[in-house]
Swiss-Prot record:
Family: Belongs to the catalase family.
Organism: Glycine max (Soybean)
Protein name per Swiss-Prot or TrEMBL: Catalase-1/2
EC code: 1.11.1.6
InterPro entries: Catalase, Catalase_AS, Catalase_clade1/3, Catalase_core, Catalase_haem_BS, Catalase_immune_responsive, Catalase_sf
The entry's keywords: Cytoplasm, Heme, Hydrogen peroxide, Iron, Metal-binding, Oxidoreductase, Peroxidase, Peroxisome
TM ranges: none
Matching PANTHER family: CATALASE, CATALASE-2
Length: 492
């Protein structure tokens, strides 16, 4: 008997009620009691099983990105970049790869409104012929901090107060007052784009710097960009209040209903590439996740398109159990020394093992569609059917061999072991340029949001002064406007 042909699924349904083990249930309306009013008997195994399963339906929610929605579709290469990467799924125009995408809010809980001012997750899992590739990003091209060592504290500051369970501005502004590199991220979060209209009308970014390697072993730094063909749209503050007040799942519903109606959302994929030999020509570190790469110097190159044309079949199986990790790459794509990426490579898989168990990659949404082979076996909830006798390597009884070697970045590393900051921080230039690119009404809304945040009564004079100093260094007039609204004098 093939156990996979008889696994529980919607395609293999009994016409009558059964227990988990398949025994028929003739009454799913009444418990087994002594007489019509007597006590319930412990031998009512159906009742015990039903309650025990119900008691364990919920799993730990994600620490971040708990609130999300998923959809399935495909990626199609439209432009040849085979000279830049040997990745099989990017080998030629016309090649299609199935995928699943999860959009999410970041900080708030699983049932929170989708209209809160918060970054949005934009995670894509490509099911390629060479294994899965997880491109795990956000709807903003930068991040709050550049070193993953700060990530737990950053999340703690953004999350609700552990005493009151209320998200409070004074905690956020206190923490980030120690991290001026966060200004660029706040220039997105407190901007109009801080609340996307829905998931279909937002762009996505890989955020971190990765590496592309071609067949000759040539390595280039790369940034990934998703551009929605529906146009980027956002909600202003009063619109967000109105939409969230009528439907706290508006973005999830919009995505689901659009796909069900045949209005398939689409994104174009672009890349920016940089030869590592030329990185010193920039006035910032290209591995600094708080920076964007100037498109006039490093132009966007089209790669392909992503179309979401199928809704998920089950929210728990294909959204809650869907797991991403930036460590999951394919030949032709590699990591960089981006300090945030380096820590994400470990942390994402680690949190999935805690949340879903050590065999989470066997779950259908996470498992590769291609053939795979290793000796990782057993452990909690291992449900892969295996019948081999050789579970070690190498062996003369098992013909499995090493795969063909693939190119990796041929970089020579050197230096002392030390904990230090990067040399070219340049924290203020890009947020200032971004602010000056806006029309006056957009600038005024940005100023107002900062004034509201800094008006929290628990924000001290010192913290307000630090933020005014930061924004003054980004743009003198911006700092002056914020200070004027707060009846303070800018320090520079």
């Amino acid at each position: 008997m093939d156990p996979y042909k008889n696994r529980p699924s919607s395609a293999f349904n009994s016409p009558f009620w059964t227990t988990n083990s398949g025994a028929p249930i003739w009454n799913n309306n009444s418990s087994l009691t002594v007489g019509s009013r007597g006590p319930i008997l412990l031998e009512d195994y159906h009742l015990v099983e039903k309650l025990a399963n119900f008691d364990r339906e919920r799993i730990p929610e994600r620490v971040v990105h708990a609130r999300g929605a998923s959809a399935k579709g495909f990626f199609e290469v439209t432009h040849d970049i085979s000279h830049l990467t040997c990745a099989d799924f990017l080998r030629a125009p016309g090649v299609q790869t199935p995928l699943i995408v999860r959009f999410s809010t970041v900080i708030h809980e699983r049932g929170s409104p989708e209209t809160l001012r918060d970054p949005r997750g934009f995670a894509v899992k490509f099911y390629t012929r060479e294994g899965n590739f997880d491109l795990v990003g956000n709807n903003f091209p930068v991040f709050f901090v550049r070193d993953g060592l700060k990530f737990p504290d950053m999340v703690h500051a953004l999350k609700p107060n552990p005493k009151s369970h209320i998200q409070e501005n004074w905690r956020i502004l206190d923490f980030f007052s120690h991290h001026p590199e966060s200004l660029h991220m706040f220039s997105f979060l407190f901007d109009d784009v801080g609340i996307p209209q829905d998931y279909r009308h937002m762009d996505g970014f890989g955020v971190n710097t990765y590496t592309l390697i071609n067949k000759a072993g040539k390595a280039l730094y790369v940034k990934f960009h998703w551009k929605t063909t529906s146009g980027e749209k956002s909600l202003l503050d009063d619109e967000a209040i109105r939409v969230g007040g009528s439907n706290h799942s508006h973005a999830t519903q919009d995505l689901y209903d659009s796909i069900a109606a045949g209005n398939y959302p689409e994104w174009k994929l672009y890349i920016q590439t940089l030869d590592p030999e030329n990185e010193d020509r920039l006035d910032f570190d290209p591995l600094d996740v708080t920076k964007t790469w100037p498109e006039d110097v490093l132009p966007l190159q089209p790669v392909g398109r992503m179309v979401l044309n199928k809704n998920i079949d089950n929210f728990f199986a294909e959204n809650e159990q869907l797991a991403f990790c930036p460590a999951i790459i394919v030949p032709g794509v590699y990591y960089s020394d981006d300090k945030l990426l380096q820590t994400r490579v470990f942390s994402y898989a680690d949190t999935q093992r805690h949340r879903l168990g050590p065999n989470y990659l066997q779950l259908p949404a996470n498992a590769p569609k291609c053939a795979h082979h290793n000796n990782h076996h057993d452990g909690f909830m291992n449900f892969m059917h295996r019948d081999e006798e050789v579970n070690y390597f190498p062996s003369r009884y098992d013909p499995v061999r090493h795969a063909e070697k693939v190119p990796v970045p041929p970089r020579i590393l050197g230096g002392k072991r030390e904990k230090c900051m990067i040399e070219k921080e340049n924290n203020f230039k890009q947020p200032g340029e971004r602010y000056r690119s806006w029309p006056s009404d957009r600038q005024e809304r940005f100023v107002r949001r900062w004034v509201d945040a800094l008006s929290d009564p628990r924000v001290t004079h010192e913290i307000r002064s630090i933020w005014i100093s930061y924004w003054s260094q980004a743009d003198r007039s911006l700092g002056q406007k914020i200070a004027s609204h707060l009846n303070l004098k800018p320090s520079i």
